[in-house]
């Protein structure tokens, strides 16, 4: 899909197309639709980021809570969104051995107990070892710092999901 097509989508089509660029949060797509026309994918991405940043703390935490636990119950039940399943598969989280799975479950539980929302990281930019390391490290963050970190990871996920949907025009260079 190119930007001309993006900008011509009806409200319903836009929300259907972009409703999961922020995991299980179609309200984000619904909110930014009225900002059309977008000059390019970066403009759309910036609009989404600005909307998320403008939310009160409870709204930002709500967005983070829409994400599943990594390698968690939803993965085992087959209840992940297609995007999340692909991202977790790419990071190697669907093939954890028993030891790594137990460690992931333990750290996820500790994290959720400490912060009140699931650990979010852009799985496509990390592998299972890096994810386990970051999860353990981020347990030491202060709550406000960790909420901001989680929101920045949500934005990275959003950026990659937008790239999956929108064709970016090729860069033409003179040789």
UniProtKB/Swiss-Prot annotation:
It is found in: Peroxisome. Its EC number is 4.1.1.97. A motif (Microbody targeting signal) lies at residues 173-175. Pathway: Purine metabolism; urate degradation; (S)-allantoin from urate: step 3/3. One of its GO terms (cellular component) is peroxisome. It is an enzyme of class 4 (lyase). Substrate binds at residues 68, 84-88, 119-123. Keywords: Decarboxylase, Lyase, Peroxisome, Purine metabolism. Its main location: other. Pfam families: OHCU_decarbox (PF09349). GO terms for molecular function: 2-oxo-4-hydroxy-4-carboxy-5-ureidoimidazoline decarboxylase activity. The active site is at residue 67. GO terms for biological process: allantoin metabolic process; purine nucleobase metabolic process; urate catabolic process. It catalyses: 5-hydroxy-2-oxo-4-ureido-2,5-dihydro-1H-imidazole-5-carboxylate + H(+) = (S)-allantoin + CO2. The keyword RNA-binding does not apply. Catalyzes the stereoselective decarboxylation of 2-oxo-4-hydroxy-4-carboxy-5-ureidoimidazoline (OHCU) to (S)-allantoin. Homodimer. Belongs to the OHCU decarboxylase family. This is 2-oxo-4-hydroxy-4-carboxy-5-ureidoimidazoline decarboxylase. It comes from Amia calva. The lineage of its organism: Eukaryota, Metazoa, Chordata, Craniata, Vertebrata.
